[in-house]
């Protein structure tokens, strides 16, 4: 059984670190952005970048780029963190209030802009339950 973890890096590099101590390049994504999160999903591996959207690697190894700056609903293309819930909903946390949701099954985007009891905007991971 081969045990490993994936590590994101600058300029679209993703490394595979074997627990035996071996480090190798796993993927070179076509971006100059940093890979901040690597998440398994029903669609395949999701590589989330800090400023260039995210990439989906399917089971055949094909990589598709979802560029957030081309989506008019998006409030901010910069991403601070990402989570996947129920295997098919990608939550993207931005520096601005609210979170962007991307449904991996339907490929639809939505935005939630919530407020707490005092009317303050919610925009951190801890503000939303995953």
What are these regions (language model features)?
Residues 1-130:
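Carboxylate-rich, polar loop motifs that coordinate divalent cations or form catalytic acidic clusters
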């Amino acid at each position: 059984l081969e045990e490993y973890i994936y590590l994101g890096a600058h300029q679209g590099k993703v490394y595979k670190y074997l627990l035996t101590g071996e480090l190798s390049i796993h993927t070179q994504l076509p971006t100059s952005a940093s890979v901040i999160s690597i998440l398994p999903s029903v669609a395949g591996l999701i590589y989330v970048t800090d400023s260039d959207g995210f990439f989906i690697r399917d089971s055949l190894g094909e990589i598709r780029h979802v560029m957030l700056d081309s989506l008019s609903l998006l409030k901010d293309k910069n991403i601070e963190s990402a989570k996947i819930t129920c295997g098919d909903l990608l939550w993207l946390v931005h520096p601005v209030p609210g979170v962007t949701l991307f449904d991996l099954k339907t490929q639809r985007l939505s935005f939630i802009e919530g407020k707490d009891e005092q009317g303050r905007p919610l925009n951190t991971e801890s503000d939303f339950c995953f």
